[in-house]
């Protein structure tokens, strides 16, 4: 297993143990720290990028629910640092942990797919005594595509979100089938956004960067992206 992946798993486990069983049932782990957990190809895992934070989403009822949740986090050892400009960020012994509510009215931002992603999250056994909730791979792709649209500056070469997407396409052979059988609205969104991505002038370079220039894997990623882009159902 890649060193970066080992570090990421340790970070996730640290957060999970601090949260405890009860709070673990309320949150879902998302973002780049979870990419490797969804990848089944060991070669691809070697190229997983390191990220210095752990991201989670949570469903809370309005401001009162959000403040109550934050109090529970403080009781578990999470703190707010005055040095952090990210309003959803807390610290756990120096580790940056971002808790994002699925209601955009609470903090002024969210991701359009968070609510459905929470509802469809799957259990993942991280350790013998720890089970976390994780996005399904189609929702991982959808949340990353939505994030890329908002902060990627239309530059797949510089986007960590795009890097995570391409790594998952490369390292999860079953992804195309999983998207194919997903909810129509989700499937169409992914297919249409991937179609736009394939038209981008820099996508070839982005893919080459992710797969370290391996011609076989470049072709494989393109083939899977083409299949995904063809899953849109106009009807």
Language model region names:
Residues 1-235:
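Compositionally biased terminal segments of proteins
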